[in-house]
């Protein structure tokens, strides 16, 4: 699902809100989440999951064109951990399909 599909689905169910208002709300939520992660904060949405930063240690990589070894610096990457309710819902949905 893309951001625009999310906005469309919300607009279908919330006819008292304009699509522009929904779009603004979704963009603001994502912006605030990005800001929080960029300052090292953890985000927890109960029943959905949590977002945090994980550190990737420096490592040696390879340039795919030349095969030359390249030292890659350590970096922080966003990490999502689904909550129990989310895990259960996904597992039930997938098991009922299969």
UniProtKB/Swiss-Prot annotation:
Source taxon at top rank: Bacteria
Pfam families found in the cross-reference section: Bac_DNA_binding (PF00216)
Family: Belongs to the bacterial histone-like protein family.
An example molecular function term from Gene Ontology annotations: structural constituent of chromatin
GO cellular component: chromosome; cytosol
Entry function: This protein is one of the two subunits of integration host factor, a specific DNA-binding protein that functions in genetic recombination as well as in transcriptional and translational control.
Biased segments, Basic and acidic residues type: 82-91
PROSITE patterns: HISTONE_LIKE (PS00045)
Subunit architecture: Heterodimer of an alpha and a beta chain.
Keywords: DNA recombination, DNA-binding, Transcription, Transcription regulation, Translation regulation
Ranges for region Disordered: 59-98
Organism: Saccharophagus degradans (strain 2-40 / ATCC 43961 / DSM 17024)
An individual GO BP term: regulation of DNA-templated transcription
Keyword Mitochondrion belongs to the record: no
Coiled-coil annotated residue ranges, if any: none
PANTHER family in UniProt: DNA-BINDING PROTEIN HU, INTEGRATION HOST FACTOR SUBUNIT BETA
Cross-referenced InterPro entries: Hist_DNA-bd, Histone-like_DNA-bd_CS, IHF-like_DNA-bd_dom_sf, IHF_beta
Protein's UniProt name: Integration host factor subunit beta
Xref: NCBIfam families: hip, PRK00199.1
């Amino acid at each position: 699902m893309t951001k625009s599909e999310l906005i469309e689905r919300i607009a279908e169910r919330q006819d008292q809100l304009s699509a522009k208002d929904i779009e603004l709300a979704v963009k603001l939520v994502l912006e605030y989440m990005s800001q929080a992660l960029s300052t090292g904060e953890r985000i927890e949405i109960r029943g959905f999951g949590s977002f945090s930063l994980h550190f990737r240690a420096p490592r040696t990589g390879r340039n795919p064109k030349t095969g030359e070894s390249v030292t890659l610096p350590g970096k922080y990457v966003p990490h999502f951990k689904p909550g129990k309710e989310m895990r259960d819902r996904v597992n039930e949905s997938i098991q009922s399909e299969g």
